[in-house]
Amino acid sequence: MMENTKIDVLGTEYAIKIVKVSECDDLKNNKFCALCNNLTHTILLGDASEEEFFGSMTEEEQEIQMKTTLRHEVIHAFLNESGLQDSAARIEAGWARNEEMVDWFAIQSPKIFKVFKELDIL
């Protein structure tokens, strides 16, 4: 099972907290399995062992679910700390043709992969 920890996201410390969805209004009320809060620099990750919210999964499926979800939230954290949380403007072409986004991934991916490796979520 994953544990609570802290990570460095472009110089900002983010706390990762594994929480029971049933005990976390932010997740439960929004029907989220996780969230990244750029104001508190916290990632809340729902404990996939709660059948009420995640269904019946094997331990392996729970681990895969949590690692996949945590990777998603870590990407949000990197986007937030890069100043892109408010840059959700409409783009004429698909986002994959957005050179700014492609550049961002090219520049930031080594740092993101370092955090993924530290968290053992690759």
Enumerate the predicted regions with their spans:
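Metalloprotease/metallohydrolase-associated module, dominated by Zn2+-dependent proteases
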Residues: 1-61, 81-122
